[in-house]
Structures are given as C-alpha cells and as structure tokens.
C-alpha cells in the first residue's frame, strides 16, 4: 500500500474512533441499534487494518469507505419524506388516470356522440398536445415560482378540466375539457419527478422517484376499473369516468398548501435559512451540514463556470456536459413513446376489439387486466431500481418490450391469415356508397373505417358474410342491407362487426399486451423520468426536465394521433412491427449513451457527462474522478470511488 493510502486509512480510522467515542459519551447505555452500528464500523476498521498490514494495495480503503457509507446511509429516514413523496405522486396518479380513462370512455363516447376516427384521435391526442405545450412552459414556471406552486397549479387544472368533462354535452366541450386536463398533466409530468428527487436522500432517491411512476400506472389501473364499473351505464357512464379525477386533484391541492418548497430551489433563490430548516425536517436525525454546503457550493460554482447571461436552454446547449445530458434525457423520453406504450394504454380496449373481442364491456374489463399488469410490474421496478441500477434495468426492459411487440404483431398476422372470406356481395341501393362491397376478406373490410362486417354463424363457421358501409349516425348498424336495423337483425341471428373480425386468435392480442407491459413497466416506464430528474445540475434541472418532458409529449402526440391511420395503411401487425423497429434502435442508444447514476448525489452526477457522449455508458472508467466528503457525526473524512492514491 502506498504511503498516501496508508495515511488516508489512518485518518479515516481516527475519524471513526472519534465518532464512537462521541457516541459513548452521549449515550452511556447504547441501544441495540447503536451497538450494531459500532460493531459494523469496527468490523470494517479491523478488516481494513488487516488488509493494510498485508499490503493489499488500495482495496482496504475502498472496503472501509463502502462500509462507512452503508452505515451512515442507514440512519432513519423521517416519515415526512414519504408523506411528501406520496402527495407529490398524486400528480402522477392524475396523469395516469386521465390518460387511461379515455380507453374505456371512448367505446361509449363514439356510439353516443357518433365519433369518427378523426374525432377519436383528437380527443386522445388533444390532451397529449396540451401536455407537450405546458411541459415545455413548465420549466420557466418552475424556475420562477418554484416546484410547489407548479404542483398547486397542476392540481387546479386537473379539477377544472374534470368538471368540464363531466358536464360536457357535445364533442367540442369534451375537446375543451381534455385540453385543460392536458395542461395539468404536462406541468405535473415535469415537476413531480424533479420535486421528489430534490427532497429525497441519495440512497432512496431512485425508489421515491419511481413511486411517481407507480402512481401513474396505479391511476391507469384505477381508471380501467372505473371504466368497467360504469360501462353498464350506456348513457352517462362516461361522465362519471371522466369526472372522478377531480377527487384526487382536490386532495393534492389542499395537501400541498401545507407542504414545503424544494430546499435546493430555495438555496438557488437565496432563501438559505428556510432551506436549512426544510432540509433538516427532511433528514430527521441526520446531519445536514455537508449536504447543505455541497448544494450551496455547487450552485455557486455552476454560476461562475456557466455564467448567467442568456436563456438557460442556450447555456445548456453551449456547455458540453449539460448538452450531453439533454441528449440522453430527451432520447430516453423519445424512445419510451416510439416503443408504443401510450398506443397500448390509450387504445388497449380498441386493440382488443380489433383482435376479435366483440363485446364492449368485455373489452373494457380485459383492458383493466393489462392496466393491472402495468401497475404490478411497476412495483417490481420500485424494488429493482436501487438493486440493479438504472442502466441495466432500462436496457433489459426495452429488450423484452421489443420481443413482446413482435409477438403482438404475429398475433395479428395469425388473425389476418384466418380472416373470413366475404361470400355475399349485395347490390348497393341507388346513390349509396358501394366501395365496401369491393373487399374480398373481413380483414380488408375492417381496415376501412367506413365499412363494417355483416354475417351469420353456422356453429363456429362464418357464413353469408358481406362488407357494407357503416351508418354514420351509429356504428352499431350498417347504412343499408341486412344489418341496417339493429333491433331487427339481432332477432334474425345476423351479426354485425365494426372494428373487428371473428377469429379464434383473439387471445394472442391479450397475451401480447400483457407480455409487453411485464417488460415495459419495471424499466422503460419509470426510468426515463427517474434519470431525467437526476442528470441535470440545479441551474438546468427545470429547463432540462421541461425539454425532455416536452419531447415525451410531442412523440406521444405523434404516436397516438397516427395509430388508427397507421393501422389502416400498414395493417394492425404492420403498426406493431414498426414500433418494434423503433424499440430496437432505442436499445442501441441506451447501450451506447446511458450512464449509471445509482447511489450518486445529484451534485456528483454532472461529472458522468464530462466525456464523449457515446462512451458514457461505460461509467466504470477512471475518467471523471470525483471526491466526496461526508460528515461522520461531527468528523469529516473523504470518500472516493477511486483508489486513495489518486487523491491529493
């Protein structure tokens, strides 16, 4: 062992000895927990001393440092941190509920309000478009007014939008309500992860930020249950579905009236005493001097290094580490959407109908199964994030998602291969559209949104089938022919299908959807939000998260607005093969560019982006060393991820 390393070991051991002496003086009769803590430190010290005497390089120092780090990160975290995280994550719950509830509500709305494919896509994507705009604007809002004010505004928008949706009497009012809700979603989506990350201790940050995504998937699952429960109210069921979001929004609003601002934002704004008080409240019995000094010094150094001239986004783009972080953050959000997640969530009931599930209520309840899968496996992600790390979890998740998309596409290929042949071609009445009668198979007929499939059944075989125009006033019946009168044709054992073909392979779509969410939910669901809440320095955090959230919502709009038309032109299986291709490209991006941020302080992570972008995936290199100081109950000693001989 080098002389410098030996000196560092001795200094660290003296610090630990001082700590234990101080504990004994303050606590004459230590409890079991204190005794256990001292034993663990003594064990680490003895281990390190033996390694030192054996001349074991610098490994002893690293072992001692890691033991000390683990011990002092195990100080009790106050329950207040969890309360703050849960109330914050109600924004995620509303995000999930308002994006998930439309899946079931759309099946009732399109019948009651006679919505064509364009209006269905508008009601889904208008929320997403508004979210994109407000997410981009949310960066400035967070920077000027703070995280707390932004969350309060989002809660108010959720409440107002839900009230408008519940009272809507036409599709235009519905569109307005969806726009208002979208504004709330956008602000919440970029603010909540940042707020949770800034109030969380480093050893819990990944899990607490992932709780936000857990609440998003919980909101989607709850929305699917509400959809199923109110699907039996054919007339006004959708009003209850869309209006119930006001309840958690009101709870969050009043809860946040009593919750604090982010201490990091307060320090940035010069409100240091208030920041110290809040940070102390968040850390309980842990000392906050080093964390407070680290945040304060980091802000001062960043202001000197980057300067304050010009818009923050321009400063981010001109400063290489933040530019690289922005590329990684925006790339993760883009590939999350291009892998098709919100097509799956927004249109899950419609996809199940496309695969051959005939009954609306059955499709809605089956969609709730997929939402429950999403929720449960997001819980798995909460457990894995601090064990496996962000990088491995994200890569493995997207790899499985790619395979699941291929399986989903193959399910639709099977259904297309056994698509019933059209055997009866009626003559169109004078002046009526005859385009639908030109199709030869049910699958071709279903790809045309203006057509439906009219048929009889002989046991399990489709007979006397025809493709005829759908009634524009109601998709429950045809514009003309045998299926023109819904009441009449049902008494004659004639069946009408719109958006689906009779098939024995409808189960493959449900299997594909479940497999997709099993792989997507633990990693690609929460990790883009978790990583983005960590990788930017404080001066760029609001703007960086606003940009990445905006990218997420922009690609969300592109995917959700085009899904039905993409399925029409590329076929259903073609659309899912396309998403699988995008996911495969995302794998290359994650492998080359995503660094590991597990266990690092927010103020340390910037150094991960000091190197060239596509080498940052190899985060174990010796480049970009950093030194960390922690206070051990009044005594300072250094912790380094590198050999102590590297530290001057």
Curated annotation (Swiss-Prot):
Induction notes from the record: Induced by hyperosmotic stress.
UniProt-annotated glycosylation sites, renumbered to this chain: 433, 458, 485
Post-translational modification: Glycosylated.
Modified residues (Phosphoserine): 6, 47, 50, 640, 645
Compartment(s): Cell membrane
Matches recorded under InterPro entries: MFS_dom, MFS_sugar_transport-like, MFS_trans_sf, Myo-inositol_Transporter, Sugar/inositol_transpt, Sugar_transporter_CS
Topology, Extracellular side: 98-125, 170-178, 234-239, 346-363, 415-508, 571-573
Keyword flag Calcium: no
Transmembrane segments: 77-97, 126-146, 149-169, 179-199, 213-233, 240-260, 325-345, 364-384, 394-414, 509-529, 550-570, 574-594
Reaction catalyzed: myo-inositol(out) + H(+)(out) = myo-inositol(in) + H(+)(in)
Segments on the Cytoplasmic face: 1-76, 147-148, 200-212, 261-324, 385-393, 530-549, 595-648
Biological process according to GO: myo-inositol transport; positive regulation of amyloid-beta formation; transmembrane transport; transport across blood-brain barrier
Entries under PROSITE patterns matching the protein: MFS, SUGAR_TRANSPORT_1, SUGAR_TRANSPORT_2
Gene Ontology molecular-function annotations: ATPase binding; myo-inositol transmembrane transporter activity; myo-inositol:proton symporter activity; protease binding
A Pfam family this chain is assigned to: Sugar_tr
GO cellular component: apical plasma membrane; astrocyte end-foot; cell body; cell periphery; cell projection; cytoplasm; growth cone; intracellular membrane-bounded organelle
Reported tissue expression: Predominantly expressed in the brain.
Matching PANTHER family: PROTON MYO-INOSITOL COTRANSPORTER
Its job: H(+)-myo-inositol cotransporter. Can also transport related stereoisomers.
Similarity annotation: Belongs to the major facilitator superfamily. Sugar transporter (TC 2.A.1.1) family.
Protein name: Proton myo-inositol cotransporter
The organism of origin for this protein: Homo sapiens (Human)
